[in-house]
Regions:
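Helix-to-loop junction immediately C-terminal to a conserved catalytic motif
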Residues: 53
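ABC ATPase NBD coupling module
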Residues: 69-83, 107, 112, 228-232
Length: 252
């Protein structure tokens, strides 16, 4: 098996004494793999994402990114090697669509023509023809279109790791299902590792090859969607996945 792109080993994180947000958190994400973090609010999902890009530092344990301790590279350099997709795309409102997609390549010093070619290719990939959308501004886009731009921006510098925090949570159900299907198609052509946080277990089942169920800062089970349905580790996992026992389209 290829070396993990992202690995947590026995990680602990607290914001107040005696109240761990993450405890003995151990998880690895391999190249080309999508792993979803699910669980109730406050279970530590977003904290794990922030540890991966050093918006937070662990109190104990180790976090490795790209085969080295996460504290080794300078934080800005680390973050430029990671793609991010968040709710509503997180676009810069006064930048055009193309300027938004070019954000990280611009920071990395790519020449203008290379940035343009990459941005236009990605806009085509996410279903936004550049001739129609490159010069638009975020306010001129629908929610689904903004989210597609957010995905294109995350992939612009071909990062080996993509972090997704509730990326499609603000979309209506029809738009959400459409972009989920498109994400699966895009993902097949990428080698990036993806760590996805979502409150929607059906979304995790559709998009992720493996799912980690968190509760009170601990991982209760890591497995495929089928593992969670058929072999839940305990009563909490069983109840958590109960409403999703009917087959759904999955990433596997």
């Amino acid at each position: 098996m290829a070396a993990a792109v992202l690995e947590f080993v026995g990680v602990g994180k607290s914001f107040a004494p005696g109240a761990p947000v993450l405890e003995d958190f151990t998880l690895a994400v391999s190249p080309g793999e999508t792993v979803a973090l699910v669980g109730p609010s406050g279970s530590g999902k977003t904290t794990a994402l922030k540890l991966a890009n050093r918006l937070l530092d662990a109190d104990s344990g180790e976090v490795h990114v790209f085969g080295e301790p996460v504290r080794a590279p300078e934080p800005a350099a680390l973050r430029r090697r990671i793609g991010y997709v968040i709710q509503e795309g997180g676009l810069f409102p006064h930048w055009s669509v193309r300027e938004n997609v070019e954000t990280v390549p611009r920071l990395l010093g790519w020449p203008d023509e290379k940035r343009r070619v990459r941005a236009e290719a990605l806009l085509e990939t996410v279903g936004l023809p550049p001739g129609e959308f490159s010069a638009r501004f975020p306010r001129e886009l629908s929610g689904g279109q903004r989210q597609r731009v957010g995905v294109a921006r995350a992939l612009a510098a071909d990062p080996p790791l993509v972090l997704m925090d509730e990326p499609f949570g603000a979309l209506d159900p029809i738009a959400r299902r459409a972009i989920q299907r498109e994400f699966l198609a895009w993902k097949r052509s990428l080698s990036a590792a993806v760590l996805l946080v979502t409150h929607d277990l059906s979304e995790a089942f559709r998009l992720a090859g493996r799912i980690a169920v968190l509760h009170r800062g601990r991982i209760l089970q890591v497995g495929t969607p089928d593992d969670l349905r058929r072999r839940p580790a305990d009563a909490f996992v069983r109840e958590f996945v109960q409403e999703f026992v009917e087959p759904v389209e999955t990433a596997t």
